């Protein structure tokens, strides 16, 4: 994803230009491990950031220091230990489903880079515990795909509602229409939508 090109493009929109000038350059990490990224997303589902971070760190600490956080090591973990780390029974199953998938399927970087967003979504959603929101976060922050708009993300909904001065949260169609001017860099635009939603002082 060419962030500089995206910023130059988005600055043509007056609302985005204001946000870019206020919040600066967005931060997108690169080269994250696919399995670890999705594992972290599952742990973080429906939890506050602080609580999820603690549980994730406890889960990682269960892996022997001489080993890597990989599918095979996760499958070796005792369910009772995972429960004591703070994972619900449902999430334990989701984590094991994910590990089992990666243990038996070769999701190689070179293959993923050639797949479309839709193909990746179709592939990952078959894993129980992975929904569209998790796929969108994976596409945005692990693969750095440039034009992702997570329709189900409340922060993005609130950001669009705030920018376009809507009285209610936008529908999927409204979000699509409002974001057309940001294509093909909606991933970067979303970074700013999250910022304006988090900024309690923003008007």
Show which residues each predicted segment covers.
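Short alpha-helical scaffolding segments that buttress acidic/His motifs in well-ordered protein cores
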Residues: 38-43, 99, 138, 189-193
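Alpha-helical ds-nucleic-acid-binding substructure associated with the helix-hairpin-helix region
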Residues: 15, 48, 52-126, 181-183
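A positional/architectural concept
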Residues: 13-67
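C-terminal accessory module of base-excision DNA glycosylases/AP lyases that mediates lesion recognition
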Residues: 1-27, 113, 132-141, 145-203
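A general alpha-helix detector
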Residues: 37-42, 58, 77-81, 119-123, ...
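Structural motif
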Residues: 28-36, 86-89, 179-186
